[in-house]
């Protein structure tokens, strides 16, 4: 049986995540009281009507604070039943959350006459801290639209051909912010930039003219070899430590040329030695 626990601050995309999981065959429960998590796992195991026992639940700040504090204990009880439990935590920058609530005109569940929206968001962070600390996968939705979030959830949670650590190699541009859910970040902004070549500016690191240009640069080759050697040595250690998800982020200025080129090469090389390696270009 597989149980996915979805949590995160209000406005970060939990409802979208549940919709994606429901469309993928999961039995979904919104706003589950955290205290009944072990019983839910037990009941799902013995329910013979679940031909494909896949369950997803959301747990949010509307829970009793005492239950949220006990989340580590409750999760351990569920996992003791030999269930694959994945904790997905969604979040976004506070300014983005404020903007989303302003645009939708929805009420935050923790606001009241004496607590502003900004204060409610900060209180929510504290309440959900025990869940965030135990998240197997964190997705920062700050720069994601609805469709990108759906694709990200499918890529990270559902497209794992084999069990074991799921690795994501992701390119990004620093001008749009560094991905907060990255475990390892490599900055390649010191490399020659195709952007300053007029004939290459409109191409990306996926296009042959940019590939040929970067492949001919000695510094690019040195950087690639150093990053590759580091990852080939240490990523198997991450897998051996029972990490469920590892994100490797490669950043350049705009996320179109250098980081894309390096990410594509790294992805192909890592796929030769590791299982469950996926490649994503955040800013293309």
Swiss-Prot record:
GTP binds at residues 60-63. The keyword Metal-binding does not apply. Keywords: ATP-binding, GTP-binding, Nucleotide-binding. Coiled coil: none annotated. NCBIfam families: PRK05416.1 (NF003828). Displays ATPase and GTPase activities. HAMAP family: RapZ_like (MF_00636). PANTHER family: RNASE ADAPTER PROTEIN RAPZ (PTHR30448:SF0). This is Nucleotide-binding protein in ptsO 5'region. It comes from Pseudomonas putida.
């Amino acid at each position: 049986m597989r149980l996915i626990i979805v949590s995160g601050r209000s406005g970060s995309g939990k409802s979208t995540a549940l919709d994606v999981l429901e469309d993928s065959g999961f039995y979904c429960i919104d706003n589950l009281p955290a205290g009944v998590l072990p019983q839910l796992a037990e009941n799902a195991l013995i329910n013979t009507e679940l031909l494909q026992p896949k369950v997803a639940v959301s747990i949010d700040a509307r829970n009793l604070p005492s239950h949220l504090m006990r989340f580590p204990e409750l999760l351990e009880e569920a996992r003791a039943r030999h269930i694959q439990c994945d904790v997905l935590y969604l979040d976004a920058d506070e300014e983005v959350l404020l903007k989303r609530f302003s645009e939708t005109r929805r009420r935050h569940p923790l606001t009241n006459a004496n607590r502003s929206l900004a204060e409610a968001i900060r209180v929510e962070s504290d309440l959900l801290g025990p869940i965030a600390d135990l998240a197997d996968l964190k997705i920062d939705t700050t720069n994601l639209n609805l469709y990108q979030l759906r694709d990200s959830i499918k890529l990270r949670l559902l497209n794992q051909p084999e069990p074991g650590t799921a690795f994501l190699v992701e390119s990004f541009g620093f001008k749009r912010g560094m991905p907060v859910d990255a475990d390892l970040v490599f900055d390649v902004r010191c490399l020659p930039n195709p952007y300053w070549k007029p004939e290459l500016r409109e191409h990306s690191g996926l296009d042959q003219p940019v590939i040929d240009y970067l492949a001919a640069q000695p510094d690019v080759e040195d950087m690639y070899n150093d990053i590759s050697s580091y990852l080939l040595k240490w990523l198997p250690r991450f897998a051996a430590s029972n990490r469920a998800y590892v994100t490797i982020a490669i950043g350049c200025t705009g996320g179109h040329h250098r980081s894309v080129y390096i990410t594509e090469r790294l992805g192909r090389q890592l796929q030769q030695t590791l299982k469950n390696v996926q490649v994503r270009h955040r800013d293309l």
